[in-house]
Amino acid sequence: MHFDFSVKFLMSLMLAPVSVYGSLPDSVSSHTNIPEVVVTGENHAPVPTTNTSQTLSLKKSDRLVLQNVSDAVRRMAGAEIKDYGGIGGLKTVSVRGLGSKHTLVCYDGMPVTDCQNGQVDLGRFSLDQLDEIRLYIGENCDIDAGALHFVSPSTLNLMSSAPIYSDKNYNAVAKITGGSFGFVNPYVSFDHKLGDHNSIKASANFSRADGNYPYTLTNGMLKTEEIREHSESVCGHGELSGRFLLSPKTHLRAKTHYYVSDRELPGGVVYYNTVNNETLKDKNAFAEVVSRTDWDSTMLMIAGKFNWSACYYHDEAMMYPGGKLDNRYFQREWYGTAVVRHNFTDHFSMANATDYILNSFNSNIHGCVFPQRHTLLDALSGKFKNEKVTATATLLGSFFFNQVEIGEAPDNYQHLSPSIAVSYKPFAPSIYFRASYKNIFRMPNFNELYFNSFGVRTLEPEKTKQYNVGATYLYESDKSLESSRLKSFAISADYYFNKVDDKIVAMPKMFIWSIVNMGYVEIKGIDFVTNLEVATSKRTSLFLTAKYAYQYAVDLTDPKSDIYEHQLPYIPKHSGNGSVAFENPVVNVSYNVNAVGKRYYLPQNIRPNMMEAYAEHGVSLYKTFDFKKFDMKLRGDVVNLTDKQYEVVRFYPMPKRSYKASVEFKF
């Protein structure tokens, strides 16, 4: 199917758009959950408030033909995924053209970080362990959060499910998925109620694939059929968590997590040379505790986390002494946060969050300086809310202290970062207008500062300014009116303008690369999301979702440069996706299309650097059977239905048509 047709299909979905409910409460009490916009999922979708926020419910994710976490994030307005291909390829998220290092990834509200390269691989998380995904852009309207949540232009929060008990004191899930290219993925979880208010949960996930999929290698007029080799991926995780009521006012959450992956790296496709011997093994373990106490008008949250990561890189080639290279990288992070919030009136509250972070890094590579970074963050926030207006404002103080064991450490850094957001509900309970501004920055990561061949210790932070205006309309039919066919409808649009100063880029100098501050970038764009739920009969329903994004992201560093006003690499001007799901008593059917316009993989926008537009289609059939003692769900997927070959990252071809099937039991 051609890309132009896919864009027209997306636009038709947008003109006929997800489920919504409820107006906002008038108080800012400690038990108020400020709603956001839900892309799709269950039959509810709270609205955007002061910032641009979206929630993707995964309880009904079959409607979207989702394959993994990165595929789910791709459906959210403003989010782009960089995928290095293959079953186990690195998958990172960038929001509104700012780059993946500007996106904070959290798991159950606690940060997931990487001080070495500043980006998190979404492939380490499984959809099976998640309940919903939230994306916040700009000012964080949740002033109960730790200070680190205010540091990034956007925050991606992956939320696991809280246990729900009805007539029994346990829940159990067993699921196995199999598919093309040797893919096997079993998952199990078990949670148990302890007394009236406490529970524990254990889960484990394992996946394996050989990843040897076919692709077409094109060199001018010559085309050959090849097999992507050296692509085996094996990974798994185990997790133990608990929720406890320590007193009538105090709740405690605790979690331990271990993840390991062992991947062959196929590398980029090079003409007539498909041999690659690189492997990468990752290990990660963390333990965290979160305590929250709610009094009548005051909330206190204290949380701590220890995170350990190890990365083992191996390569074999004649260029290395002894014919092989073994590099090892280790990270440790200690994180602590304390948040206090007080409601002065029913409409006004203030909060203060203080975070401390200690990052350390070591490696066996020559020239490692064994760096450490102490970070102190303090965020003072205020929120006002009445029937028509919601406003939040934050002043973030950031203090960074750098240390190295060898040589001279980079300068310490401190900065004050303001942000503000306002939403207005003028006359109808379902119409909201919003505007926001955020001034923030990104510290250089350890690779950019210290890496042996190109790190530069004099780098300045990358500074960003975000401006956003938007509007949302929501409709939900009266539950008592069963005759109403239109059950829910939501439409949301945002215009944004981002400025980036002192952009950190890699530049070639003679025979080596160097990291420098040399860029000024402007990004202007539009995000559009719409959803629709229609009851086509008493027993059948139709669900439609659509997203469209326009981005004009250009380099304005030097008017004399060959790349002045050229679109930034890997950022398409046009992209979007849409889905249609038909649920009925026989078998449920869902269809999805993800379309991406042309883009360039190098800064200069010339024909040799252009990557063609593509559209990927998927179809899913799913059915749940309710038995007396358990539920069983069967699902089958066809991914890349039209057998389209495309690349998300240049020289890393994605798989063509593939198949998946799964069976899930819930007890």
What are these regions (language model features)?
Residues P35-L64, T92:
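N-terminal periplasmic "start-of-domain" segments of outer-membrane beta-barrel proteins
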Residues S70-P111:
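Extracytoplasmic beta-strand/coil segments of soluble accessory domains associated
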Residues L127-V173:
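A beta-strand signature from Gram-negative outer-membrane beta-barrel systems
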Residues S247, T345-N498:
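Structural signature of Gram-negative outer-membrane beta-barrels, strongest in the C-terminal barrel
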Residues M301-D315, F433-S436, E462-K524, N531:
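Membrane-embedded beta-barrel scaffold of Gram-negative outer-membrane proteins
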Residues L544, A595-L602, L621-F667:
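C-terminal beta-signal and adjacent terminal beta-strands/loops
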